[in-house]
């Protein structure tokens, strides 16, 4: 088993770039881990059709840093830190990317089934909107307001209970 843990595998990004990494790093992804189980030791490159090279390299960087972390149990009640928006310092620095890359990382983490990375990405977005008004959130994410003033008033009245007071 030790030989399999240190073996290398090749991933092929959506733009056709092959990236060779340690199997242990790749297995942070449940999708890749299951694919490897299904393929056996065929040595074939594993296609990652939904993730381009730059995003895949960023995801691999995160997986390398976290390769020794215990696997996610999938039980959120057991792991209470999932309920906060606290993010480790390394992960905060890792997520200091432009919005497009941040959202691509979140999509890749979801597709590759890397729950811990998905959590970090979602917490990063949550921290970006925490304590902001709808107008500030629209500005942060460059979202155009398509409500009429009447619709906006109605929404405010219906959601008055949720306002900070």
UniProtKB/Swiss-Prot annotation:
Pfam annotation, one family: Skp1
SUPFAM superfamilies registered for this protein in UniProt: POZ domain, Skp1 dimerisation domain-like
Biological pathway: Protein modification; protein ubiquitination
GO biological process: protein ubiquitination; ubiquitin-dependent protein catabolic process
Coiled coil: none
InterPro entries: SKP1 (IPR016897), SKP1-like (IPR001232), SKP1-like_dim_sf (IPR036296), SKP1/BTB/POZ_sf (IPR011333), Skp1_comp_dimer (IPR016072), Skp1_comp_POZ (IPR016073)
Cleavable signal peptide: none
Region (Interaction with the F-box domain of F-box proteins): 106-165
Assigned keywords, A-Z: Ubl conjugation pathway
Entry similarity comment: Belongs to the SKP1 family.
Role played: Essential component of the SCF (SKP1-CUL1-F-box protein) E3 ubiquitin ligase complexes, which mediate the ubiquitination and subsequent proteasomal degradation of target proteins. Controls sulfur metabolite repression, probably by mediating the inactivation or degradation of the metR transcription factor.
Subunit relationships: Component of the SCF (SKP1-CUL1-F-box protein) E3 ubiquitin ligase complexes.
Name used for this protein in its record: E3 ubiquitin ligase complex SCF subunit sconC
Protein's organism: Arthroderma otae
Lineage per the UniProt record: Eukaryota, Fungi, Dikarya, Ascomycota, Pezizomycotina
Name of encoding gene: sconC
